Amino acid sequence: MQQIAKTNEQSDVLPCLVIPVQGSRLILPNVTVAEIIAFQRPNESENMPSWVLGQIEWRGTLIPVISYESYCGQKSGVMGQDIRIAVINAPNGDKGALRFFGMVVQGIPSLVKLEEPAIQENLNTSLVKGQKMAVTLETGHAIVPDLDVMEEELLAIDWQ
């Protein structure tokens, strides 16, 4: 949430996407999400962690696709007809081997423009692996996912 875009002299506004996942909502700065695409079944690979669903081709590049729920140690439920893939810009993608990865989401994200008083850290929520911070927005609760750790773990996988 560090990336604040000045829109005028009085306010700092951060355009974000609230992304529905099973049983929760994630919030990410707009610039973190490269694209939301229709779900396509990933090509499965052997010897992958259970949270890695496989790889898809996106804009001529193979990218890994993960289940956020499984990554966090939660049971991944039935994939409904509204599922999509959020293509995420890897945090260190500009200088690393992994530029993008996909995350299965449960519907269409909504755009919100956050001003600092509109978002508060929720210290009453116990965080699990994959969660950097729990926040309370004017529209409810959301989780800031830990994309840096996800990227590190994806880079450690032998894709051969």
Write out the residue ranges for each language-model feature:
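An acidic, low-aromatic, low-complexity terminal/linker signal
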Residues: 1-160
